[in-house]
UniProtKB/Swiss-Prot annotation:
Enzyme nomenclature, EC number: 2.1.1.-
Any one Gene Ontology BP term: box C/D sno(s)RNA 3'-end processing
Function: Involved in pre-rRNA and tRNA processing. Utilizes the methyl donor S-adenosyl-L-methionine to catalyze the site-specific 2'-hydroxyl methylation of ribose moieties in rRNA and tRNA. Site specificity is provided by a guide RNA that base pairs with the substrate. Methylation occurs at a characteristic distance from the sequence involved in base pairing with the guide RNA.
Protein name: Fibrillarin-like rRNA/tRNA 2'-O-methyltransferase
Residues that bind S-adenosyl-L-methionine: 82-83, 100-101, 125-126, 145-148
Keyword RNA-binding: yes
Subunit structure: Interacts with nop5. Component of box C/D small ribonucleoprotein (sRNP) particles that contain rpl7ae, FlpA and nop5, plus a guide RNA.
Keyword Iron: no
Family: Belongs to the methyltransferase superfamily. Fibrillarin family.
GO molecular function, one term: histone H2AQ104 methyltransferase activity
SMART domains named among the record's database cross-references: Fibrillarin (SM01206)
Keyword list, A-Z: Methyltransferase, RNA-binding, rRNA processing, Transferase, tRNA processing
Length: 226
């Protein structure tokens, strides 16, 4: 019998031959990206591959993930919905506003949302929050994973629009999308400084860690409004 260990609200470690990160499947019997389904005492879990998910990597890097089943999340850079689907599992009675710019990925997201009613796909540029402000309510957490050069600025723009006063920001900073020449550590330092000082609102950094060995040249950041 596999063993299940709760790591935080809605996030688990399933031990079956090896330890695997997992969430409870909100859509029983269905997979999203070829992940394994493991049933334990009548509950179906979906394994969560940290090499395909920045948020999954952050969990394994011991970030506090401030989500509950009722949380409302703005997800910037939703792509085809790999990580969005796990957030959907975690916030089973909440909502995930999934912003994605690529029409091909949006088709996948719409298909996912047809089976998971807490996912709300939004075809838009994450750098232009005014264009979707009528579609998003105040949120408890913003998760951002975008491959654009102005990543800190995008986070700040969305936070001032949508983040509750007591809310949190989880950000995956991709160094090579910002500067292909500078050392990643220099890029990370500059982006974190921007979050702390350059924009309104300003953020207090609670945690910042390199996401190796799961993702090269990426920094995970957990922050809250000052």
């Amino acid at each position: 019998m596999p063993e299940v260990k709760r790591l935080s609200d809605g996030i688990f470690e399933v031990i079956k031959d090896k330890k695997q990160l997992a969430t409870k499947n909100l859509d029983p019997g269905k997979t999203v990206y070829g992940e394994k389904l493991i049933a334990v005492e009548g509950v179906e879990y979906r394994t969560w591959d940290p090499r395909r998910s920045k948020l999954g990597a952050m969990v394994l890097k011991k970030f506090n993930i401030p989500l509950t089943k009722n949380s409302k999340v703005l997800y910037l850079g939703a792509a085809s919905g790999t990580t969005v689907s796990h957030v959907s599992d975690i916030v089973s009675e909440g909502a995930v506003y999934a912003v994605e710019f690529a029409p091909r990925s949006m088709r996948d997201l719409i298909g996912l949302a047809s089976r998971r009613k807490n996912i709300h796909p939004i075809l838009a540029d994450a750098g232009k929050p005014d264009s979707y402000s009528h579609l998003v309510e105040p949120v408890d957490l913003i998760f951002q994973d975008v491959a654009q050069p102005n990543q800190a600025e995008i986070a700040a723009r969305n936070a001032v629009r949508f983040l509750k006063r007591e809310g949190y920001l989880l950000l995956s900073i991709k160094a090579r999308s910002i500067d292909t020449v500078a050392k990643p550590k220099e890029v990370f330092k500059a982006e974190v400084k921007k979050l702390e000082q350059a924009f309104e609102p300003r953020f207090e950094i609670l945690n910042a860690k390199d996401l190796m060995p799961y993702h090269e040249d990426h920094l995970g950041v957990l922050a809250k409004l000052k």
